[in-house]
């Protein structure tokens, strides 16, 4: 934190998973794209030990609204990990709690957006949803809130899906301005 390193803001959930994996000592240096997040998910699954996740307690992260756009504030999540380490909690259990907090926080943000926009459907897309545990937890939270959940099945959920969606939007926009 106090070094001369260049640290940039990011809107990528993946960077938050990378940070959590490093803080917990699960994966300090990636040797391939997505490795820290993959190792963090594996640790969370180990904590489950084949059991079903029970979402009791208050694992909701904090979010703040900037320019009427809700954003997840990572500071309380990082502090919770550090406090857990200090208390001697196993890294695997903290990885699971991190997943639960991200799912709960994301569901809360999605619910707020749905209410504001008057919609009841949420599409889950992006590389973070390669994480099957996060996908299951968030889907459960959204459905419990009465929201329909869309997840791509014929295109990949990661950047391939995002690129496909961008191409579809571009095609629609071009069709609107092109002469008939």
Task: Report each predicted region and the residues it spans.
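A short glycine/serine-rich beta->alpha loop
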Residues: 8, 93-97, 150-157
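Short, small-residue-biased leader/transition segments that mark boundaries at the very start
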Residues: 1-7
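A mobile "lid/hinge" subdomain adjacent to the ATP/sugar-phosphate binding pocket shared
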Residues: 61-90
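Conserved phosphate-binding/catalytic loops in two-lobed NTP-binding clefts
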Residues: 120-122, 132, 138-162
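Conserved phosphate/anionic-ligand binding catalytic regions in large, soluble enzymes, centered on
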Residues: 8-27, 31, 160, 165-166
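Adenine-nucleotide phosphate-binding core of ATP-dependent small-molecule kinases
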Residues: 82-113
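Glycine-rich phosphate-binding/hydrolytic loop that grips phosphoryl groups
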Residues: 150-180
């Amino acid at each position: 934190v106090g070094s001369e390193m260049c640290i940039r803001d990011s809107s990528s959930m993946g960077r938050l998973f990378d940070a959590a994996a490093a803080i917990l000592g699960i994966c300090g240096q990636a040797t391939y794209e997505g490795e820290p997040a993959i190792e963090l998910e594996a640790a969370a699954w180990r904590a489950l030990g084949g059991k079903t996740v029970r979402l009791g307690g208050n694992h909701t992260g904090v979010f703040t609204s900037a320019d009427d756009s809700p954003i997840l504030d990572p500071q309380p999540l990082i502090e919770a990990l550090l406090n857990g380490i200090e208390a001697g909690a196993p890294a695997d259990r903290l990885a699971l709690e991190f997943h639960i907090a991200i799912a709960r926080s994301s569901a809360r943000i999605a619910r707020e957006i749905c209410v504001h926009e008057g919609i009841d459907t949420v599409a889950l897309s992006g590389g973070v949803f390669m994480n099957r545990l996060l996908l299951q937890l968030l889907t459960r939270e959204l459905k419990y809130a009465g929201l329909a959940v869309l997840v791509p099945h014929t295109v990949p959920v990661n950047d391939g899906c995002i690129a496909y969606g961008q191409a579809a939007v571009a095609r629609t926009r071009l069709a609107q301005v092109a002469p008939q």
